[in-house]
Amino acid sequence: VAEPLIQPLDAYHSPKVDMLRLDRFDALAPGNKWFKLRENIAVARKQGARCLVSLGGAYSNHLHALAAWGHHNRWPTAAFIRADEAQVTPCMADLRRWGMRLVHLSRSDYRRRHDPEYIASLLRGFDRPYFIPEGGANALGASGCADIAALLPDCGADYSLIVTACGTGATLAGLASAVAGSTRILGIPVLKAEAFMARDIAQILDDLGSPRKNWHLDHRFAGKGFGRVSDELSEFILRFEAQQRVPLDPVYTAKLCFAVDAMHKRGELAGESRVLVIHSGGLQGRSGHPALFNQSVLGISGQCSGTTKQRSNF
């Protein structure tokens, strides 16, 4: 039985809080990843590309989704990955199993990922590649994320505030470009991004032709930085999953829900009529923290038996 995408979080009242369960949306590229990939893949098809190429870290949700989709659709994929040659993570094992070609980059080389000339030099060894930026974070990825709003009644008009985690900001930009006019978007950065994220989101919105000002960022919840899980966050994850029976990933949705929980308890959401939290998927990341998620009532997989995910058509 396919479960509904919108689920109330019963612990929260005044205001009520719902969750959009994008982790239930697509088995190959769950969460926001399908939305970021779809328009990029459409352009790659039009260009006659023979290989989809991207980059990311050793636990990348984006690369995991891209490799799974490529394997299923028999389209070669490759990735420049920030990892040592000897490093093996559960995510990387999946990438290799699905046939993704991995090219290892040092941390210093990976820092050049925004340099067009450097990327062009990396792509020279590929046959008709189509390059997708880190996390699918380009205007096409954000444009795809605009379709998330279409999953909500009246494009989210029932909600005064929609809250989403931010890594690159592309999901927030897409949502901000498409939600109902009265709805505001709050982004929770999961990395220390005060110096650049707001600028990057504004640029993406300009690229989309939608320079809306209906969004803002709250940088208080980045914690120790990207992918870092503190003892306090670990305790919250276990408590939240036991109470709500909603699986969280350790990088994005854990910090997102921690932030919403903290703001609700402090009364910072008291002026809102209704709040929606975006579950952006990423549950494959649980496998990188077995000691933590083996303690969860949901286990490492975070999956409940007897349910199926809704499928996309790409």
Task: Indicate where each model-derived feature is located.
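PLP-dependent amino-acid enzyme catalytic core
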Residues: 1-304, 309-314
